[in-house]
Structures are given as structure tokens and as C-alpha cells.
């Protein structure tokens, strides 16, 4: 029966070992994501007719980097592994164990954007609209890092593309990390960057990002394996879905308000 399904490629999570220092693929994916965001952000700044400078983008992405790292790790620990943290507080600093939470990273980025907007005397929603289209590609790379780490795999299935993950008991499972890489990474990236090709009401780009990510994450959660630390099969929705619902609702509200204010200003 196992011959009917794909075998996990079993890539070493450590890309490079230099003495006691280990360079993990997961970390490389995050660095590539930030590198791409920096390249695209500076390119957009140069074409912004002076609205943004490269120096301002540098400051925004530097603050955003720390917002993602600190918020993402703290969010992962407090949303999903708080019991483990109570037993082993140093677990918080072992990023390669358990990884990062998107929802925590989002909160960290919001704090970074608030701080940067204040320093640059800029409207918060203008900052949020600028950074939102830069994020999805890095999210997709992060999910590929999860795949390489043999973590966050999906539920048992008999679909032809099911993969037998070693840490998943070599049972055929949905490669849900790759589903997220495609939807939250590539698809959302093209949606947002297509949307901004025309001038849009301030705040609407950030709102669309929240709606898009929330919807895609909510859908993929139906294919991800339940986390026994926070969910059981009897639960109606998962922790990830519960955290995504406010994003969807909030994003819709932001878009409606943005278009309403834009309409009033043009009347």
C-alpha cells in the first residue's frame, strides 16, 4: 500500500554545520524571504515619486524583521506551547524547535509598523499598505522550511499526492505545508501585487492581506493534523482557525471603511 504514495525526501534540516554552529534550512528560508522583501520594497520605493525613500524602507524592514522574529517566536510559545514553556522556559529561545507563529509575528509586525510610522511621521495605514504585498513570498518560503523540518504535516489521506512523513508515523498525509506555501505564499502574493497596480484607498491593501491570509489559513487548517496540545478531533475549529477569524472579519471591516472614506473624500 505504501508504494501508492510519495516518500518524504528526508532532507537534512541542517544545511551547513560549521563546528558548533548549525545553519538550518528553516532559518535560510526566513532570510531569503526578508531578502526578497527588501529587494521588492526598495524597488517600489525608487518608483514611488518620493513618497518612500530607500532609507525609510531600510528602517521599516529592519524593525519589521525583529517584529517577526520576536512576535513569531513568542506567539508560537504562548499560543501553542505554553505548557512546555512553563516546564522549560529556555524553550522560548530554541527557535529551531517548534518554529514561529504567523499570528504572533503579525502582532510583532504591527508593533513595528506603529513605531516606524511614528518615527517617520507617516499614516499607519500607508505603512501597512506598503509592507503587506512584501510579506506573502516569505510566508511561502517559511512553509517550505516547515516541510523540510518534517513538521506541521497534514491529516491522514489516500489522495495520490499524499506523503509519508517520518515524524507522522509513515502514514500517508496531506502535505499541508505545501498547500500553505502555494496559497499563502504564491497566490496571495500575486493577488496583492495585482491589486496594487492601480491606486487603492488607504488601508484597503492591508485589509485585503488580512482577508486573504485568514481565508487561506482557515481552509488549509481542514487538511492539517490536529495539534494534540491545543485541539482534539472533537473541536469544531482549530486554534489556527480561531486566530484567523478575527483577521478575516477585521480585514473586511478595514476594507469597507477604507472604501467608504475614499468615496466621501471624492464626493
Curated annotation (Swiss-Prot):
Gene that produces this protein: lgt
Organism, scientific name: Glaesserella parasuis serovar 5 (strain SH0165)
Pfam families (alphabetical): LGT
Keywords: Cell inner membrane, Cell membrane, Membrane, Transferase, Transmembrane, Transmembrane helix
Protein name: Phosphatidylglycerol--prolipoprotein diacylglyceryl transferase
Positions with a binding annotation for a 1,2-diacyl-sn-glycero-3-phospho-(1'-sn-glycerol): 143
EC number(s) on file: 2.5.1.145
NCBIfam families linked to this entry: lgt
Physiological role: Catalyzes the transfer of the diacylglyceryl group from phosphatidylglycerol to the sulfhydryl group of the N-terminal cysteine of a prolipoprotein, the first step in the formation of mature lipoproteins.
UniProt entry tagged with the keyword Transmembrane helix: yes
Metabolic or biological pathway, per its Swiss-Prot or TrEMBL entry: Protein modification; lipoprotein biosynthesis (diacylglyceryl transfer)
Topology within the bilayer: Multi-pass membrane protein
Amino acid at each position: 500500500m505504501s508504494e501508492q504514495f510519495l516518500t518524504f525526501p528526508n532532507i537534512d534540516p541542517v544545511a551547513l554545520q560549521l563546528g558548533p554552529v548549525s545553519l538550518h534550512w528553516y532559518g535560510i528560508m526566513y532570510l531569503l524571504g526578508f531578502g526578497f522583501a527588501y529587494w521588492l520594497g526598495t524597488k517600489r520605493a525608487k518608483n514611488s515619486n518620493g513618497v518612500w525613500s530607500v532609507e525609510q524602507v531600510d528602517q521599516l524592514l529592519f524593525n519589521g524583521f525583529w517584529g517577526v522574529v520576536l512576535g513569531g517566536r513568542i506567539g508560537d510559545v504562548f499560543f501553542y506551547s505554553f505548557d512546555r514553556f512553563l516546564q522549560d522556559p529556555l524553550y522560548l529561545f530554541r527557535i529551531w524547535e517548534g518554529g514561529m507563529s504567523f499570528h504572533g509575528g503579525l502582532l510583532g509586525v504591527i508593533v513595528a509598523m506603529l513605531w516606524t510610522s511614528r518615527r517617520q511621521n507617516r499614516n499607519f495605514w500607508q505603512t501597512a499598505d506598503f509592507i503587506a504585498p512584501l510579506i506573502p513570498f516569505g510566508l511561502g518560503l517559511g512553509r517550505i522550511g516547515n516541510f523540510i523540518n518534517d513538521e506541521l504535516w497534514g491529516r491522514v489521506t489516500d489522495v495520490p499526492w499524499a506523503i509519508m512523513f517520518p515524524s507522522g508515523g509513515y502514514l500517508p498525509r496531506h502535505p499541508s505545508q505545501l498547500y500553505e506555501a502555494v496559497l499563502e505564499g504564491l497566490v496571495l502574493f500575486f493577488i496583492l501585487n495585482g491589486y496594487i497596480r492601480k491606486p487603492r484607498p488607504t488601508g484597503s491593501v492591508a485589509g485585503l492581506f488580512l482577508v486573504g491570509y485568514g481565508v487561506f489559513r482557515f481552509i488549509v487548517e481542514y487538511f492539517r493534523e490536529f495539534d494534540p496540545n491545543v485541539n482534539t478531533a472533537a473541536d469544531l475549529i482549530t486554534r489556527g482557525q480561531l486566530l484567523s477569524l478575527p483577521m478575516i472579519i477585521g480585514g473586511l471591516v478595514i476594507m469597507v471603511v477604507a472604501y467608504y472614506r475614499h468615496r466621501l473624500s471624492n464626493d
